[in-house]
Every structure is written in structure tokens, then in C-alpha cells.
Amino acid sequence: AYCARRTLFDKDKDVKEINAETGREFIVDRSGWHLILLAKNKKGYQNLCKLVSQSWIDGFYDRPRIDKNILEKYHEGLIVCSACLGGEIPQKIMAKKIAEADEAIKWFKNLFGEDFYIEIQRHQTDKPASDTQVFERQQQIIPTLLSLAEKNNVKVIATNDVHFVEEEHAEAHDRLICLSTGRKLAEENRMHYTKQEWLKTPEEMFQIFKDIPQALENTQEIVDKV
């Protein structure tokens, strides 16, 4: 999902103030954050459908968006995960706003209880024409994510920011990014992914997160809920 920082109905301010940023993934205002929503039962699926509809009908501004007011209204039956570096909590940690990150965790924990999880990701890469800085930022925020998760009694899950299925699909994905952003493949100063965003096997994920085994174990808990 993409979750807007302000109410969706405050669109005049959006036009003046917002800069573009780059499961079903929603956006909660263009200046907002990524958020992962999963339906764990029929009610959750119905609410997910309502959120999708509202994001297109009432929340569309450059892209479909929801806000926390709508999320609060249709939260029943949903599992929520904090998302990648584009999520609210990682963004606030990277901005050194730790108290605000803690406040955001408390908000989600209060609404979703044990159905809220904090994600950690690692996309170390040596592939050509890839973003090598993502892994550095991920590593920098993981200690704080683990600390805040423990403080708020929220479980941590190890995830991969999946954008394609197989490892060999990375080059095709890179070309699709160029098409969607209107840039040439040879341009250096364009959007790059890490080329690690494929659907990794349990064995691959274990090798990446074997130092944080509980984060791997907790992913199975989500499977058992659905």
C-alpha cells in the first residue's frame, strides 16, 4: 500500500508541498510511505478490496493512495508489515527521527496488535548496474529496528523486496524500470534496483539472515495465520 502522511482530502497541500518518491502494495499521499497489507481471512479480503477501491476512487493523486484514517476504518482481518526502506518506520529512522519511528510502531501495534510485524531486509549485491547503497542503508537501520521491536514487543520478520520471480529476470526488470521512468539503459544517473529482488528460496533467505533466526521463524507465523 502507499500510505499518505496527511489526510487524502488535503490535496491542495499535496500539490504545493509533495515531492515524488518512489501482496498488494499501497501508497498511505505522494509524500507518504510504503506499507504491506495481507488478508488473513474473508473479512480481511473484503476490507482489502475496500481499501483498494478507495485508493483509486477517493485517494488517487499520481497513484492510488490510502491514509491512516481509512486504514483504521478497514483494518479488521488484515496483517500489516512495515515494508522496505520506503516504509514509514525505516524512513524516520534514516532521518534520525527515532522518537517518531517509535510513535509509528506504537500506532500500528495499538491498531493491529500481534498482526503487525517489523520487516528487515538485506540486498547485498555485486551485480553490474545495480544500487549498492541500498544494502548499506538496510544494515544501518537494522539495529534500531530490532531495538524498537523489542521495546514495543513487536515481532521481526525477514523479507525480500520482491519485484520479479527468478534471479535471471533482473535484467528484464531493469529495462522495465527504464521504460516506466523514461530513461535510457546506458544512463548512469537513473533509477537502479539491487537486482536482488527475486523470490528467494528458504535456503537463500537462511543464508542471508542466519544471524537473526527468529526473523525467519516469524515468517512462518504469518503463513499459519492465513
Identify the function of each model-found stretch.
Residues 1-226:
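Phosphodiester-processing cores and adjacent nucleic acid-binding clamps
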